[in-house]
């Protein structure tokens, strides 16, 4: 039995860090494990310009503990009105991607895209620049069942998008279904996907076991076991199309434990340990380094990291709560025991 595991230092290709005091509370958790992270732009107001992204990057950098090497990779929030020349400014400022949120699909997405065709000028500029598009892949039509919105998105949005922009790099973010895993596996080399730790570890029963458990509520929502197994198969396949993206999404505990609970699981505290658990459960620890450390930078055209981190098979208990500005934050699996621990 493997007792220690050393990996090239991984990156997180999908992360929420919020802003202000909340940002200061969570950035150190990610920086301890990951060399880089793609930062989501869904603040209030959203990060829609290169200048806003640069300012946000500076605020994140200021929260990184002294002596820790961590680089935030910035994104812009795509809207119906994003001009093509903003893509040029963004690339010049070091912004690495744009994020497409269908309007109303998730947290702070009300300023998102109402019709993908309205973004075609920006997408053409991105295709020319080689800048990836990161997609929250759910339709928002209220007539479509919440558990079917990802599968419907593939036919209604992804296929036409890929047809019209065949050279555009597209990341299908936080996939949750067998349909999405199959779609990405069968697509060309310009299409990839991120997968979260919680979608690898849990199916939708986790939300309801022993009562309603809001800290397991996220968007896209957890799905049936058949879909979880398909995600595990994809993540552990060794395919370079699939890579790590936590979608760690912190919310104050009182807004999670609420009549209208916020969507999002906070996994950044123990992200790499959770992924190690999922890969260990699948008997595929040998595939974790590719998924966590290699496939993402290769797709983005960035250098692989040179440092390493080491995990040890050592049971440890996650804290139940964390400080989060003036509030508390409850990590996923808080108070529970994990089998793998990151060595300091």
Swiss-Prot record:
A Gene Ontology biological process term: 'de novo' pyrimidine nucleobase biosynthetic process
Species lineage: Bacteria, Pseudomonadati, Pseudomonadota, Betaproteobacteria, Burkholderiales
Matches recorded under InterPro entries: Amidohydro-rel, DHOdimr, Dihydroorotase_CS, Metal_Hydrolase
Catalytic reaction(s) noted: (S)-dihydroorotate + H2O = N-carbamoyl-L-aspartate + H(+)
Bound cofactor: record note: Binds 2 Zn(2+) ions per subunit.
Major enzyme class: hydrolase
Function statement: Catalyzes the reversible cyclization of carbamoyl aspartate to dihydroorotate.
UniProt keywords, alphabetically: Hydrolase, Metal-binding, Pyrimidine biosynthesis, Zinc
Catalytic residues as annotated in Swiss-Prot or TrEMBL: 247
UniProt binding sites for Zn(2+) 2: 99, 136, 174
Assembly: Homodimer.
Gene: pyrC
Binding residue positions for substrate: 16-18, 42, 136, 219, 251, 263
N6-carboxylysine modification, residue list: 99
Name of the protein in its database record: Dihydroorotase
UniProt: Zn(2+) 1 binding residues: 14, 16, 99, 247
Cofactor(s) for this UniProt protein: Zn(2+)
The family this protein is said to belong to: Belongs to the metallo-dependent hydrolases superfamily. DHOase family. Class II DHOase subfamily.
GO cellular component: cytosol
Molecular functions per Gene Ontology: dihydroorotase activity; zinc ion binding
Pathway the protein acts in: Pyrimidine metabolism; UMP biosynthesis via de novo pathway; (S)-dihydroorotate from bicarbonate: step 3/3
Top-level taxon: Bacteria
EC identifiers of the protein: 3.5.2.3
SUPFAM superfamilies assigned to the protein according to its UniProt record, in alphabetical order: Metallo-dependent hydrolases
One Pfam assignment: Amidohydro_1
